A protein has these predicted regions:
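Alpha-helical solenoid repeat scaffolds of the TPR/TPR-like class and their adjacent stem/linker regions
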Residues: 1-622, 627-697
Length: 697
């Protein structure tokens, strides 16, 4: 070589090693003017072209280098890498094997074969080749790195962790390995360790957007949601076109109640990737939480359209259908979810709930059993299994399973006091003090108070009955009660009793069955003086009908169980009927000024407690109520009562019957299909007209 050409080559190499590729390329091309077939210069230009993404040009240059000197292993290795980039794996492997044939201990080329196999999804073969590379060079970190990636792809997470850790032990500068190791550890739920490795990644490479995103995932799993949000935002600032980071940010924002921001992040993720199924699913979750069921349904359907193999999407869609009382469609989609993912306990549980709503208790119980088999301590499944057993009339098994409610996070079953006393299981405890406390709703207390008189003869205990203020006067006449006390979240009565039992556990403790339910009525008694006063106030002709159209608005099933006053108003037009409202609370304001032809008076606003309501009911000829405490009260008083039930009734009303084993004077009117109050009121109007004509005779 001439001196000036040699200097050009040295200068080009210096620029190339320093990463100044444009200057290096310019100098290499000057050399080519003097030596157009120099294989090393052609190869170097090929490497630069590959780095710039000019893959076809890179292939031409390296092939020219090989043509000039086919005995250089490095040239074949580089060609193999280029061909892999071109999507020609077989040709790439052939080139790389040629490099190894020229240099049998060429570990770098061997790992490149593994990477080509990895890119083609041939992970098992790639692992074998990595092991070949390690035979050639036992301390080759890149071989452990590649093998770790393949093990991870095969789901062999423990082995992947070991391989990645060996790579880092050999070469702590492999930033990508810190990131990938963090991902695997997160998938193993080892989030503390994952976060530690991912922090190393972002410390070593602050502009590594993917590592910031993955650190956010680990931090969110550890409950550090605010820090996770900052990580996602950093990833997005570094790489705005990063749909996964926008998606993860949406999930974190949603968990913090930042729904508007979460929706915006979902939309951004979808803009960047229009077929991003998980982003549509996340958007659906946020919209559903905001009450936009229609929007949520559209999103879930788009998620399924983009990826129809995700059980979670069908499960979420089914939840919306169930909330809309479209139970057959809910069942259909829950079934798709469990077919796609048989080990999905929540989907089996949700399917069971939908089947229960359809009245298919046997299939529902089988699905609860499947959910419990997958997750043995699944308290919600056990508790709802109890409701299905009770709904079908299997009280013995139902009461036993009903004990699981204590393990369910339900405010309705949480007693305000923290007990340091044992629960009574039906044993003899003569001379000891037994606290019987109420739980759930007023109607539950009224229904189950019938069992209290059986306690003292069985236990020999001093019976202390604790209940809520609206029931105190009503329960004063209950036999077998030594002390009646008012429940209070401020009072801690641990020193006042020796054992305790929930009023809802009495059927279980006492072994009650469908045949042994105490059904003598009345078992509650109104105030005689108040009854007389109401009778005088309501004296006159016509059938006096007390009505209740809505329960507590915060009740979980209020949308289905309550109706509107206007639906009752048609009954006021029946000749000889006089309607009286027994309604308290905000729903009482639904009543407009009634027209003269449909006289109506709401009496409920004057009730101070349920004794007032009971005394008023005693002056009524009939009570018509949706499923509320007032229906139970009328039944407990032995008053004629018609109870209006949603298509999917509460367990206590059972199925396929128009009477109640709990209340002999009660008649049940059931919706023939979900939310069909029209049919119910048509039937009631017909029956009420018959009753009116009979009373006139």
């Amino acid at each position: 070589l001439k001196n000036d050409t040699a200097q050009l080559i040295q200068s080009a190499l210096s620029h190339h090693r320093a990463g100044r590729e444009d200057q290096a390329e310019q100098l290499y091309r000057q050399v080519l003017e003097e030596r157009p077939s120099d294989p090393y210069v052609l190869h170097s230009l090929g490497v630069i072209a590959l780095g710039k993404g000019q893959v076809e040009q890179a292939a031409q240059l390296v092939r020219a280098a090989i043509g000039a000197n086919p005995e250089v292993p490095q040239f074949h290795n580089t060609l193999g890498v280029i061909l892999d980039h071109l999507g020609q794996p077989d040709e790439a492997i052939a080139a790389l094997r040629q490099a190894i044939s020229l240099k049998p201990d060429y570990a770098e080329a061997c790992v490149n074969v593994a990477i080509t196999l990895q890119t083609a999804g041939r992970f098992d073969e790639a692992i074998k080749v990595c092991l070949e590379a390690l035979d050639m060079q036992p301390t080759y970190a890149r071989a452990y790195h590649t093998m770790g990636f393949c093990l991870h792809a095969l789901g062999r997470l423990g082995e992947a962790v070991g391989s990645y850790q060996k790579a880092l032990a050999l070469d702590p500068s492999l930033v990508e390995v810190y990131n990938q190791l963090g991902v695997v550890l997160s998938q193993q739920d080892r989030f503390d360790q994952a976060a530690a490795y991912l922090r190393q990644a972002v410390q070593r490479a602050p502009h590594y957007a993917e590592a910031h995103n993955n650190l956010g995932i680990a931090l969110r799993a550890l409950g550090h949601v605010d820090q996770a949000i900052e990580c996602y935002k950093t990833a997005i600032a570094l790489q705005p076109q990063f749909p996964e980071a926008h998606y993860n940010l949406a999930g974190a924002q949603a968990s913090q109640g930042l729904r508007d921001q979460a929706i915006e992040s979902c939309h951004r993720a979808i803009e960047l990737r229009p077929d991003y199924a998980q982003a549509y699913n996340q958007l659906g979750i946020v919209l559903a939480a905001r009450g936009d069921r229609t929007g949520a349904m559209e999103c879930y359907l788009k998620a399924i359209g983009a990826d129809g193999q995700r059980a979670e999407f069908y499960n979420n869609l089914a939840i919306v259908y169930k909330e809309q009382a479209q139970y057959p469609l809910a069942v259909q989609n829950y079934l798709k979810a469990v077919v796609l993912e048989p080990a999905f306990p929540e989907a089996h549980y949700n399917l069971a709930n939908a089947l229960k709503e359809l009245g298919d208790c046997d299939r529902a119980i089988a699905c609860y059993d499947q959910a419990i088999a997958l997750r043995g301590n699944y308290a919600d499944a056990h508790w709802n299994r109890a409701l299905a057993l009770l709904l079908k009339g299997d009280l013995k098994q139902g009461w036993r399973e009903y004990q699981w409610r204590y393990k369910v996070n339900l405010d309705t079953v949480l007693y305000p006091h923290l007990f340091n006393r044992p629960r009574w299981q039906g044993e003899q405890i003569s001379g000891r003090r037994l606290l019987v406390y109420c739980e759930q709703g007023l109607g539950d207390a009224i229904q189950f108070i019938r069992f209290v008189p059986q306690i003292r003869p069985l236990s020999g205990a001093e019976v202390i009955l604790e209940t809520w203020p609206p029931l105190i006067r009503l329960f004063q006449g209950i036999s077998g009660v030594d002390r009646l006390v008012e429940a209070s979240t401020q009072r801690h009565p641990e020193d006042d009793f020796d054992l305790c039992v929930s009023i809802m556990d009495l059927p279980y403790v006492l072994g009650a069955s469908l045949d042994t339910i105490p059904r003598t009525v009345p078992y509650l008694t109104p105030d005689p003086a108040q009854v007389q006063a109401w009778r005088q106030r309501l004296a006159g002709t016509g059938l006096k009908v007390g009505i209740v159209w809505a329960g507590r608005p915060t009740h979980g099933n209020d949308l289905n169980r309550s109706c509107r006053w206007e639906q009752f108003a048609v009954l006021a037009k029946i000749q000889g009927v006089r309607l009286y409202g027994l309604q308290k609370g905000p729903v009482a304001d639904q009543v407009p000024s009634p027209p003269p032809e449909a006289p109506f008076t709401n009496l409920g606003e004057g009730f101070a407690d349920l004794m007032d309501a009971a005394s008023c009911m005693a002056a009524m000829d009939l009570v018509i109520s949706v499923d509320t405490a007032m229906a139970h009260l009328a039944g407990a008083l032995g008053r004629p009562v018609w109870t209006l039930l949603p298509f999917a009734p509460d367990w206590r009303w059972m199925l396929h019957r128009d009477d109640s084993p709990w209340y002999p004077t009660m008649r049940l009117f059931r919706q023939p299909k979900p939310r069909d109050w029209g049919s119910v009121f048509a039937s009631i109007a017909q029956q009420l007209a018959v009753l009116t004509s009979q009373s006139e005779k």
